[in-house]
From Swiss-Prot:
Coiled coil: none annotated. The gene is ihfA. Residues 53-69 have a biased composition (Basic and acidic residues). One of its GO terms (molecular function) is DNA binding. SUPFAM superfamilies: IHF-like DNA-binding proteins. Heterodimer of an alpha and a beta chain. This is Integration host factor subunit alpha. SMART domains: BHL. The lineage of its organism: Bacteria, Pseudomonadati, Pseudomonadota, Gammaproteobacteria, Vibrionales.
Amino acid sequence: MALTKADLAETLFEKVGLSKRDAKETVEVFFEEIKQALESGEQVKLSGFGNFDLREKSERPGRNPKTGEDIPISARRVVTFKPGQKLKARVENLPVEK
């Protein structure tokens, strides 16, 4: 199961007491701020959670899996996430499901 923006809004509604409309808008604004910061080339640091960064990937050779033809993969910018120490510690202590 995945955590969705709707789930986050529902949690704000239940635990913080925001109206459902305000809770949904708060979640949307939060993610929009992160998107805008990244689009501006800024790092996003969420204390106790982790950091979002942009990384440049240079052009590299690739191959079309259907035809086997060599094709270049163009240079691009990608978003990376590095979890913070507190998040790492909480996740590392979870039991492994088999």
